[in-house]
């Protein structure tokens, strides 16, 4: 897929301005909504991926799941468009003027107070999603954006699961990022709100320590979550924060907090 900055306006409405990021699934652009005269972010799906029904279904699901949720910590989705001719499928969302949490962690461990604030915001967004029957399934620093005022935004509901909907992946397919995956997911149990809370606890652990607890191949990391205890957090982490992380990352989902 290659779209130049002087490409035609998408859907007669969204003018692309500059590339924000690109990856295996496509790219995200800063754009302008010419109808409402406001800045937006536009996610473009790679045109070659539009030939795969599962990928298109997942892209639509991201739009549907996020558009039905309203919370300050959830990036708003405004519009969706199918591929048409040489134009790719696209998703229009709130433009977040800030980096992913991964960029902050790359500078080193974060203060406990800052981590608690981030976790509280994400938990609030997850509570709304879970109440609506939506489980994110891929909470990780790369899917959490921090704007200039310190507000956290949950993004990428592309692998989310909504209660009552048909699954978008084959049985036995592991969905999520191994470094943040709950132990019960490894044993084939379905994702639930407690799975998101485990992932959130792993995000908090990484923020406080500056690194993920387990490394290796995807399978080695996944098995470590199921079989090993987390390495101790730095001694500078307050005991009550340490206990919170322990609660969120309990191996048995029944021992995690009952809700976000």
Question: Which functions belong to the PLM regions below?
Answer:
Residues 1-260:
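Eukaryotic protein kinase
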């Amino acid at each position: 897929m290659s779209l130049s900055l002087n490409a035609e306006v998408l859907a007669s409405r969204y003018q692309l301005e500059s590339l924000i990021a690109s990856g295996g699934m496509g790219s995200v652009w800063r754009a302008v909504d010419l109808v409402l005269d406001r800045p937006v972010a536009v996610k473009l799906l790679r045109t070659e991926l539009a030939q795969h029904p599962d990928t298109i279904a997942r892209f639509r699901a991201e739009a549907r799941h996020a558009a039905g949720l309203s919370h300050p910590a959830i990036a708003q989705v405004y519009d969706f468009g199918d591929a048409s001719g040489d134009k790719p499928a696209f998703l229009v969302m709130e433009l977040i003027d800030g980096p992913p949490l991964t960029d902050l962690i790359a500078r080193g461990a974060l203060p406990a107070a800052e981590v608690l604030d981030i976790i509280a915001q994400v938990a609030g967004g997850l509570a709304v999603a879970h109440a609506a029957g939506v489980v994110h399934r891929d909470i990780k620093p790369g899917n959490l954006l921090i704007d200039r005022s310190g507000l956290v935004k949950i993004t990428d509901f592309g692998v989310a699961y909504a209660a009552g909907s048909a699954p978008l992946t084959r049985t036995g397919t592991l969905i999520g990022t191994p470094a943040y995956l709950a132990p019960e997911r490894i044993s084939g149990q379905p994702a639930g709100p407690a799975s998101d809370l485990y992932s959130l606890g792993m995000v908090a652990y990484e923020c406080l320590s500056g690194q993920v607890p387990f490394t290796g191949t995807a399978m080695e990391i996944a098995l470590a979550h199921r079989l090993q205890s987390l390495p101790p957090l730095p001694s500078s982490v307050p005991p009550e924060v340490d206990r919170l992380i322990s609660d969120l990352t309990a191996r048995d989902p029944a021992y995690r907090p009952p809700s976000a």
